Amino acid sequence: MISRSALSRGSQLALRRPAAAKTAQRGFAAAAASPAASYEPTTIAGVKVASRDDSGPTTRLAVVAKAGTRYEPLPGLTVGLEEFAFKNTNKRTALRITRESELLGGQLQAYHTREAVVLQASFLREDLPYFTELLAEVISETKYTTHEFHELVENCIHEKQAKLDSAAIALDAAHNVAFHSGLGSPLYPTVDTPTSSYLNENSVAAFANLAYNKANIAVVADGASQAGLEKWVEPFFKGVPATSSGNLNTAASKYFGGEQRVAKNGKNAIVIAFPGASLGVPHPETSVLVGLLGGVSNIKWSPGFSLLAKATAANPGAEAFAHNYAYSDAGLLAIQITGKGAAVGKVAVEAVKGLKAIAAGGVSKEDLTKAIAKAKFNLLSASEVSGTGLVHAGANLLAGGKPIQVAETLKALEGVTAEKLQAAAKKLLEGKASVSAVGDLHVLPYAEDLGLKV
């Protein structure tokens, strides 16, 4: 291992940074002059890799594994795999991993989506060797011990189950009626799911063997050169198995549509969803439609131009926003509304009215221009702010595609016209919607009340 030398570099934090500051200044100038660079894909020692380098002082490195809830053979295995990340390995204890990362100023996190488990490290760019080694070690040499499962992993899962609110339950329900199994599986198992029948350290270890192999992972770096990755990925990931003896369930997604209603105390939530844009398939109209539907205003003291922002301003007590959930072979364009029951119902009615107005050609030139600009901002800021770009780049590689090409996508957004947007909205309304309501069902409307087909 090279951790000792990496740590000796990490202990000199106070003496390092004049060169890095100059590098950062050059990076900021470059960012102002041109759009964010796209991730460049390659294969290193059998591992799919994507990287982009803005010459900044920090790096984000992630292992994206095709092990999200869509692929778990039993409920709870994905979150179990996530919670075992950065625990004891054959070479290091969890305490040592934590202390070494802190000495280097690094940040470690593990999370999952419906399609992926993501192990991510953020650090100073000269510490790439240490964190590349660490991520390879975590996926190939983690100990799935009984005491850690019962004392740490199981408790974390129960805490996350207890935190599930109406908005999360409604979004899961919308996915369930839209896709049934696969993408329809909940992001976290509910409190009523009998996970004890399926979830233990042995089942998580078996799932790890299916998930963590070269055919099923992608390594994605933001802020690292491809040459640097080639230098360190090859020696450190050589111990990762090439394939697995078993197979994940990779059946193609199919959209169904439908309605689900769940009675629950507390805040109310409605999700109105339609087939959306998938990863790697250009559909700029969906991105512009999301910008036009909008949600929370970006301008203080103004409701903003978006349809949902205006609807919530007229109905205090509710919040709403639109988002396209993009997956490898499907997408879900969702309007999510939460708040007091009566206000949520009224905003839902206004949201559908707004969508029908778009389908009827009622979009002004000014609003279209604003929506396109908002779609551009969402695209360029996603990877910088939330790390979405890392996950999407990895997911595209695992699906056999290539990471999104920023320049091409920006050009496609500029080509969206009012007629194209009208046609896209009309197609959504002509098909089956996926509608979920959680909360006071006496107040929350049915899909039929909203004028939607399910």
UniProtKB/Swiss-Prot annotation:
Mutant phenotype after disruption: Mutants display reduced growth, are female sterile and lack active complex III.
MF (Gene Ontology): metal ion binding
Entry GO terms, CC: mitochondrial inner membrane; mitochondrion
Compartment list: Mitochondrion inner membrane
Entry keyword set: Electron transport, Membrane, Mitochondrion, Mitochondrion inner membrane, Respiratory chain, Transit peptide, Transport
Membrane topology value: Peripheral membrane protein
UniProt KW Cell inner membrane keyword: no
Family: Belongs to the peptidase M16 family. UQCRC2/QCR2 subfamily.
Function in brief: Component of the ubiquinol-cytochrome c oxidoreductase, a multisubunit transmembrane complex that is part of the mitochondrial electron transport chain which drives oxidative phosphorylation.
Protein name as catalogued: Cytochrome b-c1 complex subunit 2, mitochondrial
Organism: Neurospora crassa (strain ATCC 24698 / 74-OR23-1A / CBS 708.71 / DSM 1257 / FGSC 987)
